[in-house]
Amino acid sequence: MSDNTLVSDYGMCEEEQVARIAWFYYHDGLTQSEISERLGLTRLKVSRLLEKGHQSGIIRVQINSRFEGCLEYENALRNHFALQNIRVLPALPDADIGLRLGIGAAHMLMESLRPQQLLAVGFGEATMTTLKRLSGFISAQQIRLVTLSGGVGPYMTGIGQLDAACSVSIMPAPLRASSQEIACTLRNENSVRDVMLTAQAADAAIVGIGAINQKDQASILKSGYITQGEQLMIGRKGAVGDILGYFFDAHGEIIPDIKIHNELIGLKLNSLSTIPTVIGVAGGEQKAEAIIAAMRGNYINALVTDQKTAGKIIQLIEK
């Protein structure tokens, strides 16, 4: 007797079975075991018929929620860029996007970090907001922190909010040295090298993503690490964004022959590959191209962004 004829003591064809199973499962909230007992089928048969119902189109799930668009974007971006994790925050008018991104990233880290694990942190407003929101969790779970670059000042707005007992390794050097020679000397200092090696061994990392078209709103410019003239020149060379001060083009390739790259003290972007989870935190439609480039370059494998930015990213990759 085939699956498409009468297949049980109830005299139901397969399509009717699927319909009844779907109704019991989704409408009445019965478990697959309860359905199998009610219809005289094995639990495995119930599971297979549910799956067949989805594949055939008999079962269609509709989510009526303001989060539906976010979930669709998450699924599309996760599949397109092979992301480990992604969170798209729903659009809220007049909301502080930086604050919301920090909260979203903090939640992602709280779900993934285990007690006493090591978290590497890049500089930037979004990452520091994340640390503020994580402060209680960091203390309770004894999470250890390490900075990904030099520069004490850019980190203090976040690290300064932590309990004094928290374990924090800060790179004892500036983010950018005054020359390539001085940068090389500092990188070779044992105290600096030890922190860099510790950062490479982190269980997870969180980084901000800057966009060249942010102009005077870019964190690296506001912090005084590049001048407006340098920003213009870097943009003319094809840069669309940066992570940790390293600028890359739309394909995620590092822009060659840029002075700042030789003067930075911290992990290079290709060194992030040793860290299992690298979360990029960035929002605002002007950052869409930079976020795409960061994912194409495989510098991040997880993302926290907002709904409008995710929509812009989808629009750009579908062109």
From Swiss-Prot:
Q: Which residues does UniProt assign to DNA binding?
A: 32-55
UniProt keyword annotation of Transcription regulation present: yes
Disulfide bond sites: none
GO cellular component labels: cytoplasm
Entry keywords, A to Z: Cytoplasm, DNA-binding, Repressor, Transcription, Transcription regulation
Per its Swiss-Prot or TrEMBL record, what regulates the activity? Inactivated by phosphorylated autoinducer-2 (phospho-AI-2). Phospho-AI-2 acts by binding to LsrR, which is then unable to bind to the promoter regions, allowing the transcription of the target genes.
Q: Which InterPro entries match?
A: NagB/RpiA_transferase-like (IPR037171), SorC_transcr_regulators (IPR051054), Sugar-bd_dom_put (IPR007324), WH-like_DNA-bd_sf (IPR036388)
Q: Which NCBIfam families match?
A: PRK15418.1
Please state what the protein is called.
Transcriptional regulator LsrR
What is the source species? Salmonella paratyphi B (strain ATCC BAA-1250 / SPB7)
What's the source species' lineage?
Bacteria, Pseudomonadati, Pseudomonadota, Gammaproteobacteria, Enterobacterales
